[in-house]
From Swiss-Prot:
The keyword Membrane does not apply. Transmembrane segments: none annotated. This is F-box/kelch-repeat protein At2g43270. Residues 1-44 form the F-box domain. PANTHER family: BNACNNG10540D PROTEIN, F-BOX PROTEIN CPR30-LIKE. It comes from the Eukaryota. The lineage of its organism: Eukaryota, Viridiplantae, Streptophyta, Embryophyta, Tracheophyta.
Length: 208
């Protein structure tokens, strides 16, 4: 096999469609390492032009019409996936009872992390009725969730906070899969509101 320097390989890979990238991961350890690296993921996110729609459920029942400018990514999940999800730089965080799921729609890679050992908060859930199905409108256990990228070390992190009946704040490092505990903020967060990550900081609306 002709040797090609890694930098040149990365430039070639950037111009390939997703199906080719997924297939080329199996060619060699070197190629897989390049295609799964942070730098490649960031560069591909910047050059990606097509809009993506993440569809959760049974592919045969989805009613989207195909368009050249839209790329569909299908994720087969149970009803827990209908709860609110969080996004950051192309990644999707889907909390579920007992688990934190982080999905990369571009590569179809899904990582699952168990909740921290200290997860013992009662899980009363807010629900609403829609087409004879119960859909969750808050995160598991009424935790307030946040998802973003640490601007200091570049790792993606999931933050969750609870204010009743106990006050807790926990952070999951997606790189290591480890949980850490922090002091909760002085003010309650508005239940049901999603967070947003801007320049490495996560923001919520607070109760007044």
């Amino acid at each position: 096999m002709i040797y090609v320097v890694p930098d040149l390989l990365e430039e070639i890979f950037l111009g390939l469609p997703l199906k080719s990238i997924l297939r080329f991961k199996t060619v060699s350890k070197q190629w897989r390492s390049i295609l799964e690296s942070k730098s490649f993921a960031e560069r591909r996110l910047n050059v990606e032009k097509k809009e993506k729609i993440l569809a959760v459920g049974d592919r045969t029942e989805l009613g989207f019409e195909g368009e050249e400018e839209i790329q569909m990514v299908y994720l087969h999940c149970d009803i827990d996936a209908t709860r609110p999800s969080l996004t950051c730089e192309g990644l999707v965080c889907i909390p579920a009872p007992g688990w934190i799921n982080v999905l990369n729609p571009s590569t179809r890679q899904l990582r699952r992390f168990p909740c921290s050992p200290n997860h013992h908060v009662p899980s009363d859930r807010i629900r609403f009725q829609f087409r004879d199905e119960l859909y969750l409108t808050s995160f598991p256990g009424n935790w307030e969730m946040g998802f973003g990228r640490d601007k200091f070390n570049g790792s993606y992190k999931v933050v969750r906070m609870c204010f009743s009946p106990v006050e807790k704040c926990e952070v999951l490092d997606v790189e290591t899969g480890e949980w850490s505990e922090l002091n909760p903020p002085p003010n309650d967060i508005d239940v049901g509101r999603k967070s947003v990550c801007v320049n490495g900081s996560i923001y919520w609306l607070k109760n007044v």
